[in-house]
């Protein structure tokens, strides 16, 4: 770390490689990869990289920045968050749930097994409307956060059913580099729902097919049969009835953006087209050449527009590549999707990967559903504030 290395980079359309002097250093791996305003009032925080030692502090920094930009409501995206450190899940939940309330319970099989309630630690408590997004890739610590928010009616949960990983396990080392993983307890939401998905009537296929099915986290038909609710119904503070043993079921279900084979091919074509476009290699559109990224730029709606002339040139470019199997007709049938992917790649090339991701979310059906849920989330937040106010009087 701290030493220098010279790297040669060959770019599309470049006459010769470009040399850069780079100083070696640590590569940061934050829990929150992106945060920005979805519109003038709704902020977005993408907590996708697990729960690490800095997660709660990262959330505070992101929220502080969004509030400066006028945020009045927050969408916390826990989709594809596979979990992580339990104390950080408690800390994050504590930002929205008042001190002393149970966040998660740990219960063993018998009365002699370990049993404990982990409670909100207090500190900064945010009172703005909250929507939490989950999907079949949301597991463990992310389910603990979503479950507590849902049970207490502090916010709405939007998306598709979570993975359902709620086991407390210990690893006992064995010879030859092996080990035995022993399940000692289960996690339960504050109102008593088991987070662990019940596969007692299922198979190993059902377990692994849950998070990667074509329905964005909804179990395949065989898995649905295996996870029919068996426990007692639980009524949350928000007035909804849910069962344990199936992960977290969203308050409002929304399908993910479907990625068909055609859309994968269009995404690939958009990448190569914008690569040449920003290198100044698309004749007639040399003004799109981008020498370097402008990381400090805050992307706003309408910043990147794809004129019809540029889209027509993309169609020519894509059809000209005989290997991708694209035709003018099937590209036109997905014109809106293709334009979105071109905008995404342009935003990435001009500004940053975060800017490109922001463009992608503009047409994400689950994000759009979360935005539509803000008024209901606002009503829930007002009820919580009214209860807290009455308690103080």
Describe the predicted segments one by one:
Residues 45, 181-182, 243:
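Generic recognition of long tandem-repeat/solenoid scaffolds
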Residues 55-62, 67, 88-92, 99, ...:
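Stable alpha-helical elements in mature extracytoplasmic
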Residues 7, 17, 22-23, 27-32, ...:
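Sparse, context-dependent recognition of short Cys/His-centered cofactor- or disulfide-binding micro-motifs
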Residues 141, 147, 153, 160, ...:
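Polar, glycine-rich mid-to-C-terminal structural blocks
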Residues 40, 80-81, 119-120, 156, ...:
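Generic detector of intrinsically disordered, low-complexity, polar/charged segments
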Residues 1-177, 186:
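Cleft-lining beta-strand/loop regions that shape enzyme active-site pockets
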Residues 21-25, 35-38, 58-63, 92, ...:
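Generic preference for flexible, low-structure residues
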Residues 194-195, 199-393:
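Conserved functional hotspot residues or short segments at active or partner-binding sites
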